Amino acid sequence: MIRFTEENGALIAHSRNETIRIEGWGNNALRVRTTLLKKLPQDAHALTENVAHSAKVTIAEGGETAEIVNGKIKATVNGVGIICFYKDNELILQEYYSYYYGSIRKEAICYKIRSREYKGLASDDFKITVRFESDPKEKLFGMGQYQMPILDLKGSVLPIEQRNSQVSVPFVVSNKGYGMLWNNPSTGEAAFGTNITKWISDESDMVDYWITADDTPAQIVTNYTECVGRAPVMSKDYLGLWQ
């Protein structure tokens, strides 16, 4: 079972070998970090900007579940560590967990597949996989620039790495009213299947992702750029420059 605590407005969950930290990070947004290491890494990665939030943590009586709310978005964690996200109290994203006790999915719970998987490497890092339930009717957009004639990414598998003619920006916007950043600088893969969604990091010391919920894609992107930074306005001195 998991033990829940609150630390400076963040929801902390400790299991036997994993630490989960969920905290407000900007407007209507949450940052989720989990690790098997004794100390949670403090790297900001892409979340470079100082942003305010109004997150509030509630731990249920008896300590079996907990939640954190920041504006329009809410995250809940149950006794085995399954994280669910809600926009205005409507479920928008749920971790995939099929491992008997504690499972909350409607389909089979006997696959022995956990939401977050850490495979040890010859270092303090892991190959990390995070799984989410998939809505086959969902539409997904973003992820940078890939050489393919596909707008809706549902059903696509995308390598997360920079290549000649490919720019990977692991931020995706859903028509269900949320945007998610895979906040990890390592190479990896994003698989947006109709039956399961997977984010994979080839080598990392923690799970790290950021999620926001809002009413329009423009508001979602605004929340995102508030946290990762915005390009400065070009000086008029450079307008009309020919090279």
Regions found by a protein language model. Give the residues of each.
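N-terminal accessory segment at the very beginning of proteins
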Residues: 1-238, 243
